[in-house]
C-alpha cells in the first residue's frame, strides 16, 4: 500500500506544476492571437486536459472493461460540471460571453441526445455510433475554427491595450503548453492507477470506482486548470475548458473507445432494479449541464448560488453511489 500512496503523491505534484505551465501557455496563446480566453479554453486547453479521459477510456474498452469507459465519460461530465465548474463559479461568479458559449453548449446537448438514444433505446454503443461521435468531434473543431476567425476583429481594440513588451514568445508558449499537458497527463494517470488500487483494496465496486474515483481522477487536469486559472485571474479560460472538455468526453472520449471496442450498457449497478445510469447518472449529467450553462446563455453571468447548488448535487450523487 505504501508504493501506491507514494506514486499518488508524485502524480499530484506533476498535476500542480503541469497545470501552472499549461495555463500560462494557454493565456499567452490567447493574447498572442487576440482570441477570447473562453474560446481557447473550449478548444486548445480542453484537448490537453481531456487526454487522460481518452487514454483511460480507450485502454478500458480495448481490455474488455466497457463499464469503465462508459462510466468514465458520464462521470467526468458530472465531475467537471458539478464539482470543478461549481468551485469556479462559487469562488468567482461573474459575467460570461453568451456568444462564445453557444457553439460548445449546442454541440454538448446534440452529443448528449445521441448518447441517450444509445443508452435508452439501443442498450449498446456500436461502432457506427462511434464514427458518428468522431464526426461530431470534427464538426465541433471546424465550428470553433470558424468562430476563431471572427474573434480577432472583435477583440482588436482590447488587444491594443496589451503590453507588447510582456508578450511571451511563441516558442516558449508552445513549450509550456506541451510540457504542461504531458505533466498533467502523467500525473492524472499516476493518480488514477494508484488511486484505483487503493480503492479496490478497500473493497469499492468497479462501477462506483468508474463513476466517482476514476472520473474524478481523469478530471483532475480540468480541476488543476480551473484552480490555477482562478489564481491567475483567468476565469473565462476555466469555464471554456470545462464546457469544451464535456463536449470532448461525449464525442471524442466515447467516440474513440466505442469505435475501437463497442460495448453494451453495463448492468452491474442498479437502482430500484433498473440500470442506475439510466435513472440516475445520465439525468444528473444533463441536469448539471443545464444548471451551469442555461443561465449563462440567457443572462450572460454566473451566480454563486449556481455553484453551491451544483456542489450539493455532486455530494448527493457520491453519497448515493457509495450506498448502492
Enumerate the predicted regions with their spans.
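Hydrophobic alpha-helical segments, chiefly the membrane-spanning helices
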Residues: 1-324
